[in-house]
Every structure is written in structure tokens, then in C-alpha cells.
Amino acid sequence: VTFHQARPHTEQDLEIYRIVVDTWNRTGTRVSYVDLPENLRTHQNTASFLDRFKVVAGNLPYAQTIVAHIARDGHYFIHPDIEQNRSITPREAARIQTFPDNYCFESKKGTPSRTLAFKQIGNAVPVCLAYHIALSLLARFADQN
């Protein structure tokens, strides 16, 4: 399985992740940016993007949308296991998007790139969704003939 390595995080991010994961695991609620201790708030913007730190909730009957922004940071995609204390890996993001484990993500000049893999995953239509859309279209075209 390729790209199953987490990105590095700052100590400040790790401290925020601990708070966010602990709160999620105890109460099932998300932490608003303004509820973080003041010493952990690095952005002046306290009016928008207050949900910038999110735990991937594996116990819900749906998955949150993986977006290309995951290539910039993993704050919207924090692993729910507090012992791991990290954002998800490209392979975990790919699994959420229903890519098979043997799928290879392309990169420039053949050099593996976590950032490019995250971009491709975030820009993709989930594989299972694309499959079912295709089946629906095929059925519709067959009905017309």
C-alpha cells in the first residue's frame, strides 16, 4: 500500500489535534476555532472557517467530502485515534474516496509526491459514486433504445 505515511505536524497543531479529537471522542461535537485556547489560535479571522479542525468520524453513516485543500494541510481531516494524533494519510483519504489500495497516483517526473496525491484524491469523484452514475446513465441510454 503506497502513500500510507502521515505528513509532519507542528507541536501547536498536535496540541490542537489532541483537544479536537478528545472533544469529539467524548462528546461527538466539533470544536470551534474560537473555543480553542487563545495561545493556540494563530489566525486573526474569528468570523469564518470556525470549523477548520475536524475529526474524520468513522462511526457516522457517511464520510465527509475529501477536497483538494487537503494538499495544503490536514486540519479538516484529523485521524480519530488520539494515540496516533495526526491528520489522515493520502492512502486513508483515497480509501474514503473508494480508490482501490492498488491504485497508483501519478506525479511529476516519476517522483512520488504526497501533495500531488492529496490533490488528485481531493479533485476526484469518488470511485464508487462514478461507477453508480455510469450504471445509471447506461440504464437510461438502454431505455431510450
Annotated model-derived regions:
Residues 1-145:
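C-terminal target-recognition/interaction regions appended to catalytic cores
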